Amino acid sequence: MQKETFEVEYEYEGERLDKYVSILFPEQSRSFFQKLIKDGNVSVNDKVQKANYRLKTEDLVTVEIPDAVETQILPEDIPLDILYEDDDLLVVNKPKGMVVPPSAGHYSGTLVNAIMYHCKDSLSGINGEIRPGIVHRIDMDTTGSLIVCKNDESHVFIAEQIKEHSVNRRYRGIVYGVVRDDEGTIHAPIGRHPVDRKKMAINEKNGKDAITHYKVLERFDKYTYMEFKLETGRTHQIRVHMASIGHPLLGDTLYSNGKSPYKLQGQTLHAMTIGFIHPGTREYMEISAPLPEYFEKILRDLR
């Protein structure tokens, strides 16, 4: 365990505890220290405080960082469709049916297993979790572009952009029904479903702010081909928002009772493009993943 004590200088008078500690250890994220504080690993004058505690000059802040728990997830030689790669990160085109981080019932065949094999020891280890390199995720049955970070510095840099909603994330999807408006915005908070814990739902009371912009690309007799742009990245955001306006995603059995004429494995949703400031060059870059063949086949059939 790493343990260090710092005396607060005058310039940090009134600073929040979590922000102060994240300044001391810039290689880690602020959320990392918020969890550390919540777990009682940060004290002020030998007393555990909350993350929003305001510091005073000459306060003694003690930080205890537990040793990272060795992951039990094993590398697996799973082919990856790599759209871009350098020393700081890679962008992969995730296939349908692949889980991103390991979870109950999915400890093998995940994206983490694949990138551990591909990158060896070159993956970020933020929070010491069993999800090395993973800075964001997409649902198991959603395909498309996803960033993987190779070191903690790039992880923190990309995570901060995601937190500030400055990452450009555009999706393509096919929904049930004919969407009337050419474009629009859905601004509705999303939280856990009150009854079905597998689902998310519009939750005005306890939900987190969620904003989805949409644009119609093509209309068919019973379906609409659309583009979505996310301002926020809540769990199942596009799926919940579109279902809330009566146009759930084709194949999405969790949020729709609609019958699909196609044999689908989950929702017809693809993370088409991701744009961000590169942590090394500090320049904006944009990576796009081509539509998967099953998606193209449905479009050809509808046309």
Each PLM stretch: what is its role?
Residues 201, 250-263:
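Short, surface-exposed loop/helix-turn segments at secondary-structure junctions
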Residues 50-54, 227, 266:
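Short, surface-exposed secondary-structure edge patches
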Residues 82, 175, 213-216, 249:
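Conserved hydrophobic positions within beta-strands
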